Amino acid sequence: MELPKDPAMLLSLLNMKLRDAYPSLDALCDDMGLSKADIVSRMEDAGFEYDERANRFW
């Protein structure tokens, strides 16, 4: 699956999947074949960080 380039769209997609289908970012990345480091880096570059307890980016 190709991820959106737009940070707001990526934020929305990731948080929807984390809320509805995955118990953690690790599980999402493993299932979708994504690099957790790349996702976290892209989101940090856009000003967002992952909250493990809430299982979402904010």
Identify the meaning behind each predicted range.
Residues 35-49:
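Short acidic, Pro/Gly- and aromatic-enriched capping/linker segments at domain boundaries
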Residues 52:
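Short, acidic, Ser/Thr-enriched surface-loop or helix-capping motifs
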